[in-house]
Amino acid sequence: MQYSFTEKKRIRKSFAKRPIVHQVPFLLATQLESFSTFLQADVPATQRKPEGLQAAFTSVFPIVSHNGFARLEFVSYALSAPAFNIKECQQRGLTYCSALRAKVRLVILDKESPNKPVVKEVKEQEVYMGEIPLMTPTGSFVINGTERVIVSQLHRSPGVFFEHDKGKTHSSGKLLFSARIIPYRGSWLDFEFDPKDILYFRVDRRRKMPVTILLKAIGLTPEQILANFFVFDNFTLMDEGAQLEFVPERLRGEVARFDITDRDGKVIVQKDKRINAKHIRDLEAAKTKFISVPEDYLLGRVLAKNVVDGETGEVIANANDEITESVLEKLREAGIKEIQTLYTNDLDQGPYISSTLRVDETTDKTAARIAIYRMMRPGEPPTEEAVEALFNRLFYSEEAYDLSKVGRMKFNRRVGRDEITGPMTLQDDDILATIKILVELRNGKGEVDDIDHLGNRRVRCVGELAENQFRAGLVRVERAVKERLGQAESENLMPHDLINSKPISSAIREFFGSSQLSQFMDQTNPLSEITHKRRVSALGPGGLTRERAGFEVRDVHPTHYGRVCPIETPEGPNIGLINSLALYAHLNEYGFLETPYRKVVDGKVTDQIDYLSAIEEGRYMIAQANAAIDDEGRLTDELVSSREAGETMMVTPDRIQYMDVAPSQIVSVAASLIPFLEHDDANRALMGSNMQRQAVPCLRPEKPVVGTGIERTCAVDSGTTVQAFRGGVVDYVDAGRIVIRVNDDEAVAGEVGVDIYNLIKYTRSNQNTNINQRPIVKMGDKVSRGDVLADGASTDLGELALGQNMLIAFMPWNGYNFEDSILISEKVVADDRYTSIHIEELNVVARDTKLGPEEITRDISNLAEVQLGRLDESGIVYIGAEVEAGDVLVGKVTPKGETQLTPEEKLLRAIFGEKASDVKDTSLRVPSGMSGTVIDVQVFTREGIQRDKRAQQIIDDELKRYRLDLNDQLRIVEGDAFQRLARMLVGKVANGGPKKLAKGTKIDQAYLEDLDHYHWFDIRLADDEAAAQLEAIKNSIEEKRHQFDLAFEEKRKKLTQGDELPPGVLKMVKVYLAVKRRLQPGDKMAGRHGNKGVVSKIVPIEDMPYMADGRPADVVLNPLGVPSRMNVGQVLEVHLGWAAKGLGWRIGEMLQRQAKIEELRAFLTKIYNESGRAEDLDSFSDDEILELAKNLREGVPFATPVFDGATEDEMAKMLDLAFPDDIAKQLDMNPSKNQVRLYDGRTGEPFERRVTVGYMHYLKLHHLVDDKMHARSTGPYSLVTQQPLGGKAQFGGQRFGEMEVWALEAYGASYVLQEMLTVKSDDVTGRTKVYENLVKGDHVIDAGMPESFNVLVKEIRSLGIDIDLDRN
């Protein structure tokens, strides 16, 4: 088994019972693949597939002018390299994007030859089409300097859907069936039955009309309509009664309305008897061809065809007319013998279309189309052209209507056609097929569709959403181009004169900047990033709304299995509308979710893995991943639990066709990180998976001792860690840079064989948490491709580490852990276990005002020297300064207009003669409630404005860092070159050289070492070939130096050019403050099982409950939090964590007494290989075993995968191994070694019962009391009501609401109440009065009129009611 560089350092013992058959796919693949298909940037222009940008261009172009003599054709498009890299865009507040240029061709035809088009001239040109934001390698976008994510949307797939109203519309509870054809874009077409069984259609939810109008509009006559929907009964008219052609199926089950006889007149069925199978057999036996029916049997029947008098050509009766006695008389008079009527019955052949045809008043195709025109455009006169154009545009025009590939596939599948391709517009037979199926449904045949089935909902990813926006922009451009194309020839215009890219840019900008699906990335920790990118939302444009979404849409559906996680979804109004992709889920070409299964043939599991969509899955019998299998892969149980079409059942192994890939297949990333998930209640698991996303990265991340084995995948795929692009040797490493000399076999010829990784240091995330990377390699380490070189936030040795492992005791403690409160030891705070760093960004801009420019300066009047002491000569705070609320960070003055002086000021001015400065202090100060250390400052200056010293210094530092990187690369390149040179030169004969090298001397190593490397090139070699090689190496080194100098110049140019700032801004300064947050009462904490609580007290170490060996507990939790919540997983985690730590202590004890390496190996083998998945420890060298043991001292990490985790027996074994009898006795453990005797820290007395003690991975969540604590004395007031604002962000007050008023009324505190409702709230005059009274020492309140009363009076007056206050 192959271990990576980091895995060797610390192996996680897995309790999994099944081998890994399918690796978890790359977690961000959905986003990255979708966007790369949209751009197709690396595909040559001629080989691009018709998807993404290419599809958008080809769907809109060519654009033809109104007169048809000029057209604009699309040739290809190209994307330029982005001007700034991702980091520069974030610093400067820019969008990371690329310019899109399209090559278009303007073709002008000769107007003189109207019959045959002759090309007069062709102009080809590249035209700028706007900027397209680019995706970062981690699947996000940088828009205006902030990282955003485009969430995928789950929407109803295009196609045709049949449903009924579940009997809710009509009072009788009758099921009303309906069908809807949904295109990707274009008009929706609905068909619906009303309670009277008339079939209607409507376009785009407008007024409904009888469906036969639509059928006539597509060219069918009433006869054809009836022939399409009914079978006919054939009658031969006699002088009395008639003969009915005998069709057995149509008679069975009917009640005979007359005696039915055979040919010989023998009665086979008596009148009023029900016709059964025996009667039919008798009639068939008698070879009956016709049945004689009486006259009244014909009355009320409906004619299927027009009946025409053969001689006169006169129409006697129309199709769909009922037969009456007068009609029969006319038929007999005209000598017509044969007639056809519609066959209908009450059971499975209703007369719906016939009834609809009666309601329909239109006569022919034209009338039907006019009726549709009137419905779509009420009030407009229907001219013939307009009517035709509108009808054709509705469903038949490719510009206005697009079913899409998916829609056509779904449509054809639903109406039972074999081929899945076809035209993208609606065809006449499509409409007919839909109506036929709907009528069949009403007749009781077939099933309605389930709209929550994942075969009927598809995912729209970034690429598709962006393509739709881009197309919308192009369509706007098309309209403008059409107008101008007419003038193209006369005014000799070029393509760039025709195309204005503004509409495209604005459509794209609006989508990425403010669409509902473009969200501010949740960057609290690596898990929250991954989850955000794997999220699937049913909301957004073209989706559902929170208010309209019912229970069914939100519910878990059987087809979610392995596609969408049944656990992870938000609590609250969005529950079930926002979901997360399951671990192995993946999208197929149509956008439907697929999940992998192992193929099973004749009860034997193969290695073949097939991805099935929800529709395909319904056809197979699928076993679960935990089905018992022998070594050959045969299913061993007699009956296997399996699923078919959403139903679970037990079947024999030979019926199984597929099997799940892994037990964790059904859950998402966040849920699969919860150990013992199978023992938690679903609601708590939901909270657990949501709260892991809110865990704040700790100062020193610590891996969970009990994990699930998915932690490494999660950390690596999130992009928080640094991975090696290529293998090699670590050449240099410090806190901020890692330099790797690449292996020769991986280096590309002619390229620099050096990889330099600049680590991210103390950077602010979107949520103000700290992103910091720490190297985990040493100089000289050999690394392979994909190895983790540096840890990021919340990762430890390449594994996700969201919290800390805490020693937990489940026991009450003086009521301090009542109702989920958490009691924490002071030691946890002292050791900085949960200390986190938060970084705040504060901005100040100097603008150009009407009165003159604002200035950033140190020269500010009325400021104490203490305040100015932190600012440098440019007026900007020093890095490293510790600042409190109210301190000045950047000095800024704004010119102010001439002010009117008060008489006192005039007097002072006259005496002292000082002209008051005409600027006011508008410096950037630290906001209230914040303090910290300045860790970075960035200064941006507009083009053409002199940079201050600080800005220049920042640029110089950046260039210095860049030069360091280049020097490192050069050093390694030159080192390699000189090594090759030395190997080549030693032993060669020289013709002369430096240091008086004689001709014919053989060069040796000592001579070369004595010479400066650059003088080696001065050696003249006798061998011409070697001399040429020497020259080539010299040239390649000089070439590299030249390249590096060019790169440095490029960087310098980029840094020294002015910054792009918003209009009117001259200078912008960003100051970054690092705030250290220690754990304190009021902070929210949680485990991974939804067991959340608030810290109630931090207790001194000496008062905490402790064990017999003096070790105090870190956290005391209330045992009552477990049973009612049913999340027993936390207790199991504590037990296994206890074993993990115990094993670590035993290994530590062995290392301390310097036990033999064999003993260590034997103990490690016992841990790793006696149960669960075996590890290959024999492949480790002694040094590696030693390093492994050192890393295991703090606890052997365990992995208990979801649904395939540690059993009770395995846990008991591990506890026995961790706590031999002597240790167990010393700690006074119970026999199963998971409870310990604890002693009260205050009295030293042992507690009466043993206590469950162990280690749990505990998280600190992003709900910190520091961010919520807030107080106000005076502050801003609302303009209209004059009441204080609300909320911390507005520095608002606390609302004194209705209930609080009742409380004061109950106490009879009338004056307090009056004060609350007037001077403390919105009585403006009263407020000033109170202040004056207090200054005078007169403590009296004169309450005036509350402003809200005045607002009420104004509102009543606005209703037209005159109201006045009677002040008497």
From Swiss-Prot:
Record's protein name: DNA-directed RNA polymerase subunit beta
Q: What does this protein do?
A: DNA-dependent RNA polymerase catalyzes the transcription of DNA into RNA using the four ribonucleoside triphosphates as substrates.
- GO molecular function ontology, one term from the record: DNA binding
Please give the CDD domains that the UniProt record associates with this protein: RNA_pol_B_RPB2
What reaction does this enzyme carry out catalytically? RNA(n) + a ribonucleoside 5'-triphosphate = RNA(n+1) + diphosphate
Question: GO biological process annotations for this chain's record?
Answer: DNA-templated transcription
The record's annotation in Pfam families points to: RNA_pol_Rpb2_1, RNA_pol_Rpb2_2, RNA_pol_Rpb2_3, RNA_pol_Rpb2_45, RNA_pol_Rpb2_6, RNA_pol_Rpb2_7
Q: How does it assemble?
A: The RNAP catalytic core consists of 2 alpha, 1 beta, 1 beta' and 1 omega subunit. When a sigma factor is associated with the core the holoenzyme is formed, which can initiate transcription.
Q: Which family does this protein fall into?
A: Belongs to the RNA polymerase beta chain family.
Which species does the entry assign this protein to?
Burkholderia multivorans (strain ATCC 17616 / 249)
What's the gene? Answer: rpoB
Task: Please name the SUPFAM superfamilies in this protein's record.
Answer: beta and beta-prime subunits of DNA dependent RNA-polymerase
| EC nos | 2.7.7.6
InterPro entries for the chain: DNA-dir_RNA_pol_bsu_ext_1_sf, DNA-dir_RNA_pol_bsu_external_1, DNA-dir_RNA_pol_su2, DNA-dir_RNAP_su2_dom, DNA-dir_RNAP_su2_hyb_sf, RNA_pol_bsu_bac, RNA_pol_bsu_CS, RNA_pol_bsu_protrusion
User: What keywords were assigned to this record?
Assistant: DNA-directed RNA polymerase, Nucleotidyltransferase, Transcription, Transferase
Q: Which GO terms describe its cellular component?
A: DNA-directed RNA polymerase complex
